Amino acid sequence: MKIFIDTANVEEIKRISKWGILDGATTNPSLIAKEGRQLKEVVEEICSIVDGPISAEVISLNCDAMVKEARDLAKIHKNIVIKIPMCEEGIKAVNILSKEGIRTNVTLIFSPQQALIAAKAGASFVSPFVGRLDDIGMDGVSSIKDIAEIFKIYDIKTEIIAASIRHPMHVLEVAKAGSHIATVPYKVLMQMIKHPLTDIGIEKFLEDYNKSK
């Protein structure tokens, strides 16, 4: 499974990029706003660090405006993927953009039915939200599994990006469910490399080594 980082913080991306594990990155208007910088500036810098798909989201809510915004964003870098919300106007925009060769990532997916519609419209990626489904008592991982099964049956090339990842177990679960990609927050990536038994083991090795000196 591919690993994307879900952040607009360049310092976080720089740190994780040194691990050599990043296949891409996702941003959204909330993450960009948190950084207090212009979208174009942030996205350009991310593209210079991560060699893979970088999702940048439109903020318009009607098809024509989305398409115009998407075309401008796509000019920033060859790795830009246009993030578009799952709604009727968004699906119309995805259809237009796919015919122009502009890659899209349909976000705010909460059901396999939505994922199927987005894929049929020409989306390069779909982003089902795992954590937010869990928040309302539904099973976000099961949704990923259903989407993966449907895409496999019908040989749909759209890639699944498991989003709204809250903890390391989510990453494990979506990998087992067949997601092509997980977009993971910085905090969760840092948690993934840690384990209390690893820390105990390192301490024991050092203790034994120092005793032998």
From Swiss-Prot:
Gene Ontology molecular functions: aldehyde-lyase activity; transaldolase activity
Main location: cytoplasm
This protein's record includes keyword Transcription: no
E.C. designation(s): 2.2.1.2
HAMAP family: Transaldolase_3b
Pathway participation: Carbohydrate degradation; pentose phosphate pathway; D-glyceraldehyde 3-phosphate and beta-D-fructose 6-phosphate from D-ribose 5-phosphate and D-xylulose 5-phosphate (non-oxidative stage): step 2/3
Active site (record annotation): 83 (schiff-base intermediate with substrate)
Catalytic activity: D-sedoheptulose 7-phosphate + D-glyceraldehyde 3-phosphate = D-erythrose 4-phosphate + beta-D-fructose 6-phosphate
Top-level taxon of the source organism: Bacteria
Top EC class, one word: transferase
Protein's GO biological process: carbohydrate metabolic process; pentose-phosphate shunt
Keywords: Cytoplasm, Pentose shunt, Schiff base, Transferase
Keyword Chloroplast: no
Cited function: Transaldolase is important for the balance of metabolites in the pentose-phosphate pathway.
Signal peptide, first to last residue: none
Family classification: Belongs to the transaldolase family. Type 3B subfamily.
Database matches in InterPro entries: Aldolase_TIM, TAL/FSA, Transaldolase_3B, Transaldolase_3B/F6P_aldolase, Transaldolase_AS, TSA/FSA_arc/bac
Pfam family, one: TAL_FSA
Organism: Clostridium novyi (strain NT)
This protein's name: Probable transaldolase
Intracellular or extracellular location(s): Cytoplasm
GO CC term, one of those recorded: cytoplasm
